């Protein structure tokens, strides 16, 4: 399935926006707080409080390694994809087998790791910083999962280019 012009523009901006999100937000799972910008710490802290994101609060080891993979594999790919989408015509993007291969690899990696996060949210979601680890309500789980859902669905489409 090819990417049309509008889809290419969408993914161009998706990757542009995802670069600072990866650097300042997602990286908070692996980078010690003393090396993070204050504003990034506040954004993460506010997100955890508002969305009850126990994963970003808890930072389980498996999530740590997912984020390491995001920083080592996906972040350089974001720059590569931005360059390719910015400087290529629709025909070039759809006929560039190397680009398509990397889009698929990114798609599978990002959608699978995010799917695991979503499953964990529904399986054991709880309110962060609560001593009793009170379970999230179904509404709260759905709200938190909806934050993760775009980073499952958007990359999933790339598995089929």
Swiss-Prot record:
The keyword Transmembrane applies. Residues 32-61, 123-141 are lumenal. Residues 7-159 form the EXPERA domain. GO terms for biological process: protein targeting to mitochondrion. Keywords: Endoplasmic reticulum, Membrane, Transmembrane, Transmembrane helix. InterPro entries: EXPERA (IPR033118), Sigma-2_receptor-like (IPR051987), Sigma2_recept (IPR016964). It comes from the Eukaryota. This is Efficient mitochondria targeting-associated protein 19. It comes from Saccharomyces cerevisiae (strain ATCC 204508 / S288c) (Baker's yeast). The gene is EMA19.
């Amino acid at each position: 399935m090819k990417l049309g012009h509008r889809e290419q523009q969408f993914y161009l901006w998706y990757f542009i926006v995802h670069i600072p999100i990866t650097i300042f937000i997602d990286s908070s799972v692996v980078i010690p707080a003393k090396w993070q910008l204050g504003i990034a710490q506040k954004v993460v802290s506010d997100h955890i409080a508002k969305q009850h994101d126990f994963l970003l609060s808890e930072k389980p080891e498996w999530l740590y390694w997912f984020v390491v993979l995001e920083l080592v594999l996906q972040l350089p790919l974001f720059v590569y994809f931005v360059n390719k989408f910015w400087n290529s015509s629709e025909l070039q993007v759809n006929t560039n087998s190397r680009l398509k291969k990397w889009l698929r690899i990114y798609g599978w990696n990002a959608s699978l790791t995010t799917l695991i996060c979503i499953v964990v949210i529904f399986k054991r979601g709880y309110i962060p910083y609560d001593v009793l680890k009170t379970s999230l309500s179904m509404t709260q789980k759905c709200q938190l999962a909806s934050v993760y859902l775009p980073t499952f669905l958007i990359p999933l489409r790339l598995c089929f280019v």
